[in-house]
Amino acid sequence: MAVNVRDYIAENYGLFINGEFVKGSSDETIEVTNPATGETLSHITRAKDKDVDHAVKVAQEAFESWSLTSKSERAQMLRDIGDKLMAQKDKIAMIETLNNGKPIRETTAIDIPFAARHFHYFASVIETEEGTVNDIDKDTMSIVRHEPIGVVGAVVAWNFPMLLAAWKIAPAIAAGNTIVIQPSSSTPLSLLEVAKIFQEVLPKGVVNILTGKGSESGNAIFNHDGVDKLSFTGSTDVGYQVAEAAAKHLVPATLELGGKSANIILDDANLDLAVEGIQLGILFNQGEVCSAGSRLLVHEKIYDQLVPRLQEAFSNIKVGDPQDEATQMGSQTGKDQLDKIQSYIDAAKESDAQILAGGHRLTENGLDKGFFFEPTLIAVPDNHHKLAQEEIFGPVLTVIKVKDDQEAIDIANDSEYGLAGGVFSQNITRALNIAKAVRTGRIWINTYNQVPEGAPFGGYKKSGIGRETYKGALSNYQQVKNIYIDTSNALKGLY
């Protein structure tokens, strides 16, 4: 299936500052391509420090009035954004597919609708938020107010460009903040098109979108003195840099980083559910998911029964044209990611690991211009293996045999990460006990990779700081002010 790219995507994009697309301070641009075909989609402006400074100052000015708008006004604007996203769902989903390489069935059913739902959700959250009053005694009262922080500086990863942007923009502006946000330089196009919705709905300067390199303009956003709150989704290595910037400027930061999550299949699991859940855990979005269930821990009693079923399931996955509704897995997002995946396959071949399924780049039937990789299953002898410890970020699943629940817990916790995990069992008490013992921010039971609004998402350990996607995330973007009132009109007698 082929579409006319210009029906969806402009040939060039400027920076979105103060409600308008504007030229950058430099004439430098970055080429944006379709990873499935190599086709050039657009050229974006390469923002410089001067552009970051301009955007932050605009956001500061807009904050003065935006922070004073009523909650009901803000809620209505968020609902309008969500409604318009859904009205343009098919167009924005196609842009996401063209730019990211993920299947159209995913962008249409998940990425864009869930982004819209986050705007609707945080509209309701801000409308129903209430402060508190504590009558300390008959003469003194403590009032707790939740106030916006100011200007939010955010950078989001390339794997879910629009959805991750919604995770940050919706609560930030719901709370009364303004935001300067930068998408990945390789996948910026959906957010740039959605800027046209912001243009229609929001006052100027509330949302500002910069494009450029993370190491340049992204770093400048996080280190700007005018930014009051940092929010980042991406690798743990870059997360350290964002945390350092937050410490240097003494501002709060929300960090959603890497993972190496364990998906535990117990001997009493429903194997039909387990096989589907395993695929959801590692093949969804081509495995380019921070919460991917990339370590499969299988009870030894069912190992020989489950593994052949997985081999068959993996071999039947339709990998191909992301625009085809029948495609189940599309292209990896770029050559760097494909090369990284291949390096782990090479490491497996040079070790005592055993490749049970896949392990190859796909180039036949017109796939040679893209970055397609087979669903891959690799048995490793133990959790100390390189493939069991390092985040691959692709459709590569390592499988480890375990003898009992405690060994599964111990292996699951033997990781520097703690973002997510899964347990498959028909005994809910057994599953809950494991879920409570595994040190991660999210555990799915009898499913995987479900990310609805209303359920907190975030990690332990090196997987990050803070939680997103639920009502408590609003507090990430607020200051708490206490007003203490003494009505006694009496001297305290200390001086």
UniProtKB/Swiss-Prot annotation:
Residues reported to bind NAD(+): G212, K213, G214, S215, E216, S217, G218
Entry's family note: Belongs to the aldehyde dehydrogenase family.
Q: Which SUPFAM superfamilies match?
A: ALDH-like
What residues make up the catalytic site? E256, C290
Gene3D superfamilies noted in UniProt? Aldehyde Dehydrogenase, Chain A, domain 1, Aldehyde Dehydrogenase, Chain A, domain 2
**Keyword check for Oxidoreductase:** yes
Q: What is its EC number?
A: 1.2.1.3
What is this protein's record name?
Putative aldehyde dehydrogenase AldA
> Which molecular function term from Gene Ontology is one that the record holds?
aldehyde dehydrogenase (NAD+) activity
Is Oxidoreductase set as a keyword in this record? yes
Q: Which domain of life is it from?
A: Bacteria
Q: Which keywords annotate this record?
A: NAD, Oxidoreductase
Reaction(s) catalyzed by this protein?
an aldehyde + NAD(+) + H2O = a carboxylate + NADH + 2 H(+)
List the InterPro entries hit by this protein, alphabetically: Ald_DH/histidinol_DH, Ald_DH_C, Ald_DH_CS_CYS, Ald_DH_CS_GLU, Ald_DH_N, Aldehyde_DH_dom
A Pfam family recorded for this sequence: Aldedh
